[in-house]
UniProtKB/Swiss-Prot annotation:
GO terms for molecular function: BMP binding; calcium ion binding; collagen binding; extracellular matrix structural constituent; heparan sulfate proteoglycan binding; heparin binding; integrin binding; protease binding. Residues 334-346, 352-370 have a biased composition (Basic and acidic residues). Changing residue 317 to G: In EDM1; atypical form. It comes from Homo sapiens. Disulfide bonds join 91-102, 96-111, 114-125, 131-142, 136-151, 154-178, 184-197, 191-206, 209-221, 229-243, 237-253, 255-266, 282-287, 292-312, 328-348, 351-371, 387-407, 410-430, 448-468, 484-504, 520-741. Residues 527-757 are annotated as: Mediates cell survival and induction of the IAP family of survival proteins. Abundantly expressed in the chondrocyte extracellular matrix, and is also found in bone, tendon, ligament and synovium and blood vessels. Increased amounts are produced during late stages of osteoarthritis in the area adjacent to the main defect. Its cofactor is Ca(2+). Pfam families: COMP, EGF_CA, TSP_3, TSP_C. Transmembrane segments: none annotated. Plays a role in the structural integrity of cartilage via its interaction with other extracellular matrix proteins such as the collagens and fibronectin. Can mediate the interaction of chondrocytes with the cartilage extracellular matrix through interaction with cell surface integrin receptors. Could play a role in the pathogenesis of osteoarthritis. Potent suppressor of apoptosis in both primary chondrocytes and transformed cells. Suppresses apoptosis by blocking the activation of caspase-3 and by inducing the IAP family of survival proteins (BIRC3, BIRC2, BIRC5 and XIAP). The record marks 77-78 as: Cleavage. Residues 87-126, 127-179, 180-222, 225-267 form the EGF-like domain. This is Cartilage oligomeric matrix protein.
Length: 757
């Protein structure tokens, strides 16, 4: 290296000398230019020297690495073929990764483990990305460092210390902890005063006004004006509930239409079936969340207990077979076995070996009438039973017509054919149609022939109805001063001196159902709303263009469903009423068709009843014979007094919006001419006081009143039975049905009379 450097130096000097002005001896002073050149040359030599040193270090490192990877010991020389010994490695600077200890062993130098936060063999270590272990709180950014990691601050709505660490094990075992801040407790919310603040994870929500306040988050919550019960006492009911005064003087809270709950708490009830859309913080059954929010199902039936009500569950029994294809939609039967090939699978068929699509079971013994040798369960075989469908173990038959008195519609007059053209349970052979008080009971069978009393109450069973009996309980105390008018108590004991005798305290009719829940507290024969037993009436029995209605009763008789696109028909309960309040929820659970549905009251026979019916769209009936009938959309109240009874005349008269002579009178029509909406729930309220002819019907869509007939006066029918009506419309639901005996004349009756005068 030295000779080469000297040559470079001499050549440089020679070149400089030749280029100068004049010749200068070699030992003379060099000019400034030569000095600069020498300095630059020297700097270049220094750079070369440093590069050489770096190369030496790299070559040494490579050599050590190769030697470290090979097995130590004797190696055969490539050149001589003789065994040779490879020299042992020794610890030296740079042999191991910075911070890693070098250990000298008998077999040579070894490096310790990589530092925390790194991975490798000690000689070479690379950084570990601890962020891959997700040590930070969700939504918090993780920053990888060399070595280690750190988490950014907890997100808004949470609090917690800073978090950082080194190593994968630490990152996995130690997660960042961020605790939710309860803004409702710390005051870090912006809800208006006197409203409900609801804490959520990482945030909060502002709810409705607190009890006792009204308004919202936009307008603020102001203290609600004091509300009072009918007796003048302060009301503790929910703002969407009414305070009701009971017979015994106690107060109850009842949620308003469109709301459900226990009255102290009420929540939205979209489908108007009596159950709130969301669970309320109260223990009563009516505080539970509705398992079908948009389809009324007042019984909340849920066969497979999956939390989805049968009314809105596409596979109600959970057997994997959709309802529309399942031959037992409410009984699990994935095999769909059906021995008798009727509509019902063996799992739910009450006559497995005999077709019986109606599944009728009169005595409710689990065996269908079609295969039951004792249909009524009175221990007399059907063939020998003179009332095979009505229990009558005595088999009494007064008129000897082969029909037992228990089921004979003319028990005192022979009529083996039992013809009853007007469906009033009085056979044609003895039906006089003479009814001077118009209550639906012919004079010969009426226990008060001149006083309307469709219910025919007779508390003392003396043959004289309570309506015309001065001593209903026959205890010797006239009704006018009897403190228990319906229960014998000649001593008139009244310990608390409240005017109600001890024997009828809290249960006026002594039917063992307390007055508070008794729908007819002055009629021991009627206690709860129940349509499980009902009469079917087909209003167009001729022809086969359409089928008869198919009625399904649910919720212990408080819900009815009609499934078929059918001829006009009725499902009528057997209980007759004088004054009555009747309410229910109406819902068409399909987008198919646009025809009539409604309810009836004052039913006396198939030619005499009131009907409230609702059509969706305007339509002319497809059969123009016997006359052209045009239905308009909207709610209609009609009085039916047909001279022909069920048949084509009555059918078309019912379809037609208007009067039809000798058939139907239109008493009121909703002037809005608005039809019902598909899959929308409506709540109706009917008041009927036949003693004065008072009728009023109201309809609600949610909490909003959408139709009101106001006072309508008509005395065509002075009492009768209740039921539901359909005409060519399928999938109708009448849910949360309630009736209540009520003879009290509403205040607006007097107001109406004054206006008329």
């Amino acid at each position: 290296m030295v000779p080469d450097t000297a040559c470079v130096l001499l050549l440089t000097l020679a070149a400089l000398g030749a280029s100068g002005q004049g010749q200068s001896p070699l030992g003379s002073d060099l000019g400034p230019q030569m000095l600069r050149e020498l300095q630059e040359t020297n700097a270049a030599l220094q750079d070369v020297r440093e590069l050489l040193r770096q190369q030496v270090r790299e070559i040494t490192f490579l050599k050590n690495t190769v030697m470290e990877c090979d097995a130590c010991g004797m190696q055969q020389s490539v050149r001589t073929g003789l065994p040779s010994v490879r020299p042992l490695l020794h610890c030296a600077p740079g042999f191991c990764f910075p911070g890693v200890a070098c250990i000298q062993t008998e077999s040579g130098a070894r490096c310790g483990p990589c530092p925390a936060g790194f991975t490798g063999n000690g000689s070479h270590c690379t950084d570990v990305n601890e962020c891959n272990a997700h040590p930070c709180f969700p939504r918090v950014r993780c920053i990888n460092t060399s070595p280690g990691f750190r988490c950014e601050a907890c997100p808004p709505g949470y609090s917690g210390p800073t978090h950082q660490g080194v190593g994968l094990a630490f990152a996995k075992a130690n997660k960042q902890v961020c605790t939710d801040i309860n803004e409702c407790e710390t005051g870090q919310h912006n809800c208006v005063p006197n409203s409900v603040c609801i804490n959520t994870r990482g945030s909060f929500q502002c709810g409705p006004c607190q009890p006792g306040f009204v308004g919202d988050q936009a307008s603020g919550c102001q203290r609600r004006a004091q509300r009072f019960c009918p007796d003048g006492s302060p009301s503790e009911c929910h703002e969407h509930a009414d305070c009701v005064l009971e017979r015994d003087g106690s107060r109850s809270c009842v949620c308003a239409v469109g709301w459900a709950g226990n009255g102290i708490l009420c929540g939205r009830d979209t489908d108007l079936d009596g159950f709130p859309d969301e669970k309320l913080r109260c223990p009563e059954r009516q505080c539970r969340k509705d398992n079908c929010v948009t389809v009324p199902n007042s019984g909340q039936e849920d066969v497979d207990r999956d939390g989805i009500g049968d009314a809105c569950d596409p596979d109600a029994d959970g057997d994997g077979v959709p309802n529309e294809k399942d031959n037992c939609p409410l009984v699990r039967n994935p095999d769909q076995r059906n021995t008798d090939e009727d509509k019902w699978g063996d799992a739910c068929d009450n006559c497995r070996s005999q077709k019986n699509d109606d599944q009728k079971d009169t005595d409710q013994d689990g065996r269908g009438d079609a295969c039951d040798d004792d249909i009524d369960g009175d221990r007399i075989r059907n063939q020998a039973d003179n009332c095979p469908r009505v229990p009558n173990s005595d088999q009494k038959d007064s008129d000897g017509d082969g029909i037992g008195d228990a089921c004979d519609n003319c028990p005192q007059k022979s009529n083996p054919d039992q013809a009853d053209v007007d469906h009033d349970f009085v056979g044609d052979a003895c039906d006089s149609d003479q009814d001077q008080d118009g209550d639906g009971h012919q004079d010969s069978r009426d226990n008060c022939p001149t006083v309307p009393n469709s219910a025919q109450e007779d508390s003392d069973h003396d043959g004289q109805g309570d309506a015309c009996d001065d001593d209903d309980d026959n205890d010797g105390v006239p009704d006018s001063r009897d403190n228990c008018r319906l229960v014998p108590n000649p001593g008139q004991e009244d310990a608390d001196r409240d005017g109600v005798g001890d024997v009828c305290q809290d249960d006026f009719d002594a039917d063992k159902v307390v007055d508070k829940i008794d729908v007819c507290p002055e009629n021991a024969e009627v206690t709860l709303t129940d349509f499980r037993a009902f009469q079917t009436v087909v209003l167009d029995p001729e022809g086969d263009a359409q089928i008869d209605p198919n009625w399904v009763v649910l919720n212990q008789g408080r819900e009815i469903v009609q499934t078929m696109n059918s001829d006009p028909g009725l499902a009528v309960g057997y209980t007759a009423f004088n004054g009555v309040d009747f309410e229910g929820t109406f819902h068409v659970n399909t987008v198919t068709d646009d025809d009539y549905a409604g309810f009836i009251f004052g039913y006396q026979d198939s030619s005499s009843f009131y009907v409230v019916m609702w059509k969706q769209m305007e339509q002319t009936y497809w059969q123009a014979n016997p006359f052209r009938a045009v239905a308009e959309p909207g709610i209609q109240l009609k009085a039916v007094k047909s001279s022909t009874g069920p048949g084509e005349q009555l059918r078309n008269a019912l379809w037609h919006t208007g009067d039809t002579e000798s058939q139907v009178r239109l008493l009121w029509k909703d002037p809005r001419n608005v039809g019902w909406k598909d899959k929308k729930s409506y709540r109706w309220f009917l008041q009927h006081r036949p003693q004065v002819g008072y009728i009023r019907v109201r309809f609600y869509e949610g909490p909003e009143l959408v139709a009101d007939s106001n006072v309508v006066l008509d005395t065509t029918m002075r009492g009768g039975r209740l039921g539901v009506f359909c005409f060519s419309q399928e999938n109708i639901i009448w849910a949360n049905l309630r009736y209540r005996c009520n003879d009290t004349i509403p205040e607006d009756y007097e107001t109406h009379q004054l206006r008329q005068a």
